[in-house]
Amino acid sequence: MTNGDVLAAVDKLKQFNQEFEFIHVVGESTLPLWLALSEAQKELSAIYHKPAFVLLEAVFPTEDSDGSGGIYDWAAQMETDRKKIANTDIQVCAAWGRIVRLDGRTQIANLAGLVSGRYAKAPVQESIGKTRPDAGYGFSGARLTELLPAGYNNSVIELLDVAGYLTFREYDGLSD
């Protein structure tokens, strides 16, 4: 799917007659799409009176063939990119994990899909970041077996979090 395809789909929401609150664009995306969707979201809200927030999935960090461009370079570039978006209704998920599907298969996936489910479950005034077990927003180790990629540690997570990305983290002492 191209950026143009995504923007054409969002453009159809101008005439969509049902209520909606958020748009989740599934699949890796980069700054050009984030910027275009930021403008489209502002137009939907201001002109068409359809406020919504947009959830996107960042590109999985990989090393270049020469071994350069590791996770810290990727995180620094992500921080730079986020500064170019002046829209609090655009959220980019920069977290991946190995998840166990309902049929028992494991898959490496961006965790925005899990977040979408938590948003649907949560009352509007409640944060999905609650960590109390009775809050019901955590993910069990049986469902989310590990955070990825390798090297996705607290320093990288903190950099991305401060920059405004949606991140996941594990807390020492907090178990299933």
Task: Label every PLM stretch briefly.
Residues T2-D176:
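A glycine- and small-residue-enriched flexible loop/hinge signal that marks low-structured segments
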